[in-house]
């Protein structure tokens, strides 16, 4: 029996992501098909000056990632911000962070499934009108693949990530050689180009929020930390490594597109594709087109791994019924996979994910802000704990990350605070449904 059990554990460990695999998983979780539309969306507000805002947002994401990297070093299991909040501030806070986090990831997955169908039909017009069947078919396929075990999902995730990075990396490399030419042609002049009737502050705020959408997903790796080998060491390194790579790629893609098209960015529906064609000829168009499809397919595969494990982590911590965390012989959280799939299916049928996604940004920050605060608290609670990465300058960076995050929420829409309050009331109500008046603080560090 012991030998069989040992072999089973060895097989489970082998199925997990290595450090390089974890880094690729992190890149895949952030880069979706939206990267191919990003230059046009942000150029409309500020012109070439959007590059400066991109740099600023990348700094914010690095601050949040640094906090995430430190807190991840305390844990070796799934849950991400929920785990950190629970350990630092107790079950009530952990439940709120976890339930809102799970909800927003299900909503995001439904949106990504719909996005996959849309891009699939753009690539293969013969399937026009079959959006819903394509989305549901993808959902069922990924759920079955996930039930088959992490090894299968991992193989497809890494394959899709490498495939989608080919056109992105190629474009970025070519962009390096064309940026100076774009400067000479005047495509970066004037540097600041405000839309008529808008203020500088509102343009910066809206552009910053849109750019931030492009980075959403960097927290995903911490949510599935239990699926990584040696997570306390590898997850912090992979978080910082993946977000650094993504930041460089984003900057080069935006700069390269502006260099090639300048103001013509606003006159095309496919800015990166058109810019790539000008760089390397007609072959650039299909490279970007198929790259976008593979990109969002890879994103969906990654979400199918993460979303149910978020719910299962809540069950593992006894914040939701333990049956939700039940695993099959392949160590896949089969009940959480089915329930997550049902919720995503219902959202696809209703179409409500679109309206929900518009204010879900505030619930994303419910993952980021508690993580930054937990970095300060856990450091005080466990001063002797050696972590792979420790945020420098004491509490300065976590506090700065929290302040800038709040400014981002307000800059997007002040109604975000109302939506956030409503979400907290609902989540708190659910906590009392499941736990009655058992408000207690969990101070034990998980092992």
Residue positions per predicted region:
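Helix-loop-helix connectors at the membrane interface of multi-pass transporters/channels
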Residues: 1-10, 86-88, 113-135, 167, ...
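Membrane-interface "cap" regions at the ends of multi-pass membrane proteins
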Residues: 1-40, 44-49, 55, 62-66, ...
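Hydrophobic, membrane-embedded alpha-helices of multi-pass small-molecule transporters
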Residues: 17-36, 138, 178, 193-257, ...
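Hydrophobic transmembrane alpha-helices that form the core helical bundles
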Residues: 41, 53, 62-139, 143-147, ...
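TM-loop-TM module centered on a large, flexible mid-protein loop between adjacent transmembrane helices
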Residues: 83-84, 90, 121-126, 191-194, ...
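Membrane-interface loop-to-helix entry segments
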Residues: 117, 130-185, 216, 239-243, ...
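C-terminal membrane-solvent junction of multi-pass transporters and transport-like membrane proteins
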Residues: 156, 323-334, 368-417, 437-447
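Hydrophobic alpha-helical segments and their helix-loop junctions in multi-pass secondary transporters
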Residues: 162-192, 254-261, 372-385
